[in-house]
């Protein structure tokens, strides 16, 4: 399901207190290239592993992202219909409620408390931000040889800089993985 504008607004309110990890497939147009980050940090340092995951939205396509988030101690999922989908095989809680309403309560709660971000959280945030920024720059500067990757990158760059806004559908696993690297919009699978 495409991420709503309201959901994005509340994610922005939480962005100074949480690391928002996502696949490009959901249309959250910020940093991208999560698989590149995970490839670079996986097995290198456990300090990247979150102690808490709040999952919103649909399924996660990236096997690497699923595997990484399985290591979190606590995993909660917001489920508007009450469905329990244990993407990470270690779910600890399901919040039965509307995604936007739940994010609003969390974001407003943080803002009302007006708490300073603890040093440990700020350090974790900085660690992730640097890693995501490096991956973002790598993807922008990456020039693949003539291949499927080159075709998808060229297509996505044309789309990104155009005024035209079609709904783009990727239909097989290879194209979806490539879209997850290069797309900065919602991708229909």
Language-model-derived ranges and their functions:
Residues 3-6, 63-64, 105, 154, ...:
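Phosphate- and divalent-cation-binding pockets in alpha/beta enzyme and binding domains
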Residues 69-174:
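Phosphate/pyrophosphate-binding active-site segments
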């Amino acid at each position: 399901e495409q991420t709503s504008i309201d959901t994005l607004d509340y994610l922005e309110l939480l962005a100074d207190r949480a690391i928002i990890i996502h696949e490009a497939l959901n249309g959250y147009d910020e940093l991208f290239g999560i698989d590149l980050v995970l490839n670079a940090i996986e097995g290198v340092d456990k300090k990247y592993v979150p102690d808490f995951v709040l999952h919103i939205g649909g399924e996660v396509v990236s096997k690497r992202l699923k595997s990484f988030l399985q290591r979190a101690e606590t995993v909660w999922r917001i489920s508007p219909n009450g469905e329990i989908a244990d993407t990470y095989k270690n779910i600890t809680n399901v919040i039965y409620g509307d995604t936007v309403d739940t994010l609003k309560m969390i974001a407003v709660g943080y803002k009302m408390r007006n708490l300073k971000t603890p040093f440990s959280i700020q350090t974790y945030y900085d660690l992730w931000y640097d890693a995501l920024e490096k991956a973002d720059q790598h993807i922008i500067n990456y020039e693949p040889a003539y291949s499927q990757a080159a075709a998808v990158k060229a297509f996505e760059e044309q789309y990104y800089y155009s005024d035209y806004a079609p709904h783009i559908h990727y239909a097989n696993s290879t194209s979806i993985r490539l879209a997850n690297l290069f797309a900065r919009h919602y991708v229909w699978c």
